[in-house]
């Protein structure tokens, strides 16, 4: 599945290839020394897929949420589809333009723990496994290379909350509520927990002191782990 590992794109998309190629890809990803290497290696795997694969992911996702309310389902499906297709295109453009070569920052802490989690979640075989790995690759690119949430700003959650981007900070209403879920992205996501409604609200257009005070208060009173 990874360029240079003697696995062709046909192998990567062959359901029989299964977990062995994924394990090889994860080992390659985990050895990346900086963000540029990580981005290049993620792109080399993701771009073996196509927009058709993204559409299949969308169809699979729709089946999972078909029983929720139509308003919530349609909003969520639209946002996730935009995110998946947009991230695939971003990876393609960054790879074509050589953008990763200028990214010399070290990989963030927690990257290897993330790939260990992905390895556990991507055991088995079949096309469903390949698409599951693709989902984790896209999320890893967003969280570690782009320093963006695994779920984009505007993603709605049950109860009316959504991921928000306010004054340079991402907030998520479920950041601290899913850490017991084995496959949750929350422990690795750079978003902060959305403050309780009516208690702490992000200041609009704050100065540096206000922003630092808000983040400090969020940490002290809400035990942020982002």
Describe each model-derived feature in a short phrase:
Residues 1-7:
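N-terminal acidic, proline/glycine-rich, low-complexity intrinsically disordered segments
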Residues 12, 16-226:
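Cysteine-centered metal-binding/redox modules
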């Amino acid at each position: 599945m990874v360029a240079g590992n003697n696995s062709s794109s046909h192998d990567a998309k062959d359901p029989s290839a299964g977990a062995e190629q994924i394990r090889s890809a994860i080992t390659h990803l985990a050895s990346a020394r900086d963000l540029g290497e990580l981005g290049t290696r993620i792109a080399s795997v993701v771009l073996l897929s196509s927009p058709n694969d993204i559409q299949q992911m969308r169809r699979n996702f729709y089946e999972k949420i078909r029983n929720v309310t139509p308003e919530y389902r349609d909003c969520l499906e639209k946002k996730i589809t935009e995110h998946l297709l947009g991230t695939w295109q971003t990876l393609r453009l960054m790879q074509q333009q050589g953008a990763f070569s200028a990214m010399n920052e070290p990989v963030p802490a927690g990257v290897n723990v993330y790939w260990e989690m992905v390895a556990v979640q991507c055991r088995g075989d079949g096309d469903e496994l390949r698409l599951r790995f693709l989902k984790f690759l896209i999320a890893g690119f967003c969280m570690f290379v782009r320093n963006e949430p695994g779920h984009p700003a505007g993603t709605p959650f049950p109860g009316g909350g959504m991921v928000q981007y306010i004054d340079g900070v991402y907030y998520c209403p479920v950041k601290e509520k899913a850490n017991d879920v084995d496959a949750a992205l929350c422990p690795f996501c750079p978003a902060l927990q959305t403050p309780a409604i009516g208690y702490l609200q992000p200041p609009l257009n704050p100065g540096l002191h206000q922003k630092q005070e808000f983040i400090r208060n969020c940490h002290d009173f809400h035990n942020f782990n982002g």
